[in-house]
A protein has these predicted regions:
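Substrate-binding and catalytic surfaces of secreted/luminal carbohydrate-active proteins
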Residues: 1-165
Length: 165
């Protein structure tokens, strides 16, 4: 996406859909989608990141003819029962604090950037929101530096967190 942005910097980029296959691997799906879809697309100039599809039945319906027949909805609706799936938590985690009008701001990590992928935003009410994923198999302790004020945090292996400062 950054290559496209660099070639056409005046054009807007939209990451419009990514699906989770059934059956879900909850921890693996959360980690991959937070890293690649939410953090990855936003760090590479996307104005949105959209998980697809929003809702499905236990039979993974409806879907368009020839469309994805094993796409798991963010929620599964079975008559009077609603099941929350990985897509729900991915969307909810990002959308709770990154509200419309938020703008991505620079963020980084002094170690291996693949170990602690992150993305930061400035919200319309002037708060800094940072999404961080511990992408390795051990606990990580790290610092968040906002204008010289340092906060220390830790994440267990595979854990994702949102910081609102």
């Amino acid at each position: 996406m950054s290559t496209l942005h660099n070639a056409y910097p005046d054009k807007s980029l939209y990451f419009t859909e990514q699906w989770i296959g059934a059956p879900a691997n909850f921890a693996g799906d959360i980690k991959w989608h937070m890293r690649e879809v939410i953090i990855g697309s936003m760090r590479n100039w996307s104005k949105i990141a959209l998980e697809w599809n929003l809702a499905s039945s236990p039979k993974l319906e409806p879907h368009t003819p020839g469309g994805c027949s094993n796409c798991l909805g963010a929620i599964t609706i079975d008559v009077n029962k609603v099941t929350l799936n990985p897509g729900y938590y991915i969307i909810a985690h990002a959308a709770k604090h990154i509200r419309p009008g938020s703008v991505r701001i620079e963020s980084g990590y002094s170690g291996n950037p693949d170990d602690l992928p992150n993305v930061a935003f400035l919200t319309p009410d002037n708060k800094v929101v940072i999404l961080v994923l511990n992408n390795i198999d051990t606990k990580q302790i790290f610092n968040i530096n906002i204008n010289g004020t340092i906060f220390t945090s830790e994440l267990a292996a595979g854990e994702v967190a949102t910081y609102v400062l």
